[in-house]
Amino acid sequence: MTASIAQQKIRIRLKAFDRRMLDLSCDKIIQTADTTSASAIGPIPLPTKRKIYCVLRSPHVDKDSREHFETRTHRRIIDIYSPSAKTIDALMKLDLPSGVDIEVKL
């Protein structure tokens, strides 16, 4: 089973609203991969998604008075080549902030 895992690639996609929290999570993942002798490539930054919301300021009339809010979703990809079972266990036990969304593909 270890031989089949060693030939695979793990792709980790990270998403967060806060860029600093995302970068800290990427650093933890890369550091964990390096300590278990797996080669990590990344973090590769993907385009930031901007979602703009337009809200009327007044509850009644005044359609001309509007306010804009936006959310920015920052994304990164990390590829881990030649992972061992030890690497996968270390990544599963890794404690990351709750504001970071993680998708793992083998």
Curated annotation (Swiss-Prot):
The gene is rpsJ. Involved in the binding of tRNA to the ribosomes. InterPro entries: Ribosomal_uS10, Ribosomal_uS10_CS, Ribosomal_uS10_dom, Ribosomal_uS10_dom_sf. Gene3D superfamilies: Ribosomal protein S10 domain. Pfam families: Ribosomal_S10. Part of the 30S ribosomal subunit. Keywords: Ribonucleoprotein, Ribosomal protein. Disulfide bonds: none annotated. GO terms for cellular component: ribonucleoprotein complex; ribosome. GO terms for biological process: translation. One of its GO terms (molecular function) is tRNA binding. PANTHER family: 30S RIBOSOMAL PROTEIN S10 FAMILY MEMBER (PTHR11700). Belongs to the universal ribosomal protein uS10 family. This is Small ribosomal subunit protein uS10.
